[in-house]
Amino acid sequence: MMHVTGEPTADRLVLRGLRARGHHGVFDFERRNGQEFVVDVELGLDTRAAAASDDLSATVHYGELAERLHAAVSSDRVSLIETLAQRLAGVCLSESAVDWVNVTVHKPGAPISVAFDDVSLTIHRSRHD
């Protein structure tokens, strides 16, 4: 995970526990009724310019990003959390300051016939992939 200068991108911005209702899943009842999805994102970016200038435009506006992620979960149905995670990674990487992202999609209401706490998928995507 390198910044464009060749230096490692050590700075991370984390948004955890974003909740949104989506109609994703393999089964008809999931797509019809919907359920809550929980999203965590970890963004790799260089925050030195923002810290030096104290200027929001030099970093990621996490409030706006949260709204865009929420909209991405709430829109266009997909069958797999893998597809949803890829969509969310694309939202994060559309921010020019972001070098890489880890996206975790939790599906706590997944239709599993035994007791469980959560099912989740984490993906890593880079601007250079």
Q: Positions of the model-derived regions?
A:
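N-terminal, polar/charged subdomain of small-to-medium soluble alpha/beta proteins
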Residues: 1-129
